[in-house]
Amino acid sequence: MEKYLSLSGNHSSNKRSLEGLSAFRSLEELILDNNQLGDDLVLPGLPRLHTLTLNKNRITDLENLLDHLAEVTPALEYLSLLGNVACPNELVSLEKDEEDYKRYRCFVLYKLPNLKFLDAQKVTRQEREEALVRGVFMKVVKPKASSEDVASSPERHYTPLPSASRELTSHQGVLGKCRYVYYGKNSEGNRFIRDDQL
């Protein structure tokens, strides 16, 4: 009777590779990190599973995943989705910020209210209460860009320079010279502090 199984690093995006999990009905911990698993992930019913990590995979559809997990893993208490597009994180995408991550946590807790830990952070009472009230509204929806919008919008490259300085013939430069050179052996970190400030 196996209770712990790690299939990390198999780099298998094939659904058939997880079909054998149905033989492990008493499984309590399942680690599926670094496997290139996508939105077509299908887990068998695992009624005793309380820990599931799906870090660094290719999961993008959060709602579909959470609905599936609610159905097949009723005892789930610990879930980690770090490193997936579905988990907005500043380390994975520069477009995401802390507010995106808070909305994500709220939505996950709304869908899976029995979680005690999410992405290695303990679920707080305040997060749980907010998920009950606002969780249904925290689903992140982005409009799909139609091919007409992409074709009709001119391509612009961002530049921090004023428009006048972008001309190819109007290059300007600045040359400066440092007037002070430190030749001493000691730090001058506090040379601006007067004796009466010590």
From Swiss-Prot:
The LRR repeat ranges on this chain: 2-22, 26-47, 48-69, 75-95
Organism this protein belongs to: Homo sapiens
Known tissue expression: In the embryo, expressed in melanoblasts. In the fetus, expressed in melanocytes. Not detected in retinal pigment epithelial cells.
Annotated function: Required for melanocyte differentiation.
Gene Ontology biological process terms, A to Z: melanocyte differentiation
Keyword annotations from UniProtKB, A to Z: Albinism, Differentiation, Leucine-rich repeat, Repeat
Domain of life: Eukaryota
Pathology noted in the entry: Albinism, oculocutaneous, 7: A disorder of pigmentation characterized by reduced biosynthesis of melanin in the skin, hair and eyes. Patients show reduced or lacking pigmentation associated with classic albinism ocular abnormalities, including decreased visual acuity, macular hypoplasia, optic dysplasia, atypical choroidal vessels, and nystagmus.
A Pfam family matched in the record: LRR_9
Native organism taxonomy: Eukaryota, Metazoa, Chordata, Craniata, Vertebrata
Protein name as it appears in the record: Leucine-rich melanocyte differentiation-associated protein
All copies of domain LRRCT, residue ranges: 96-134
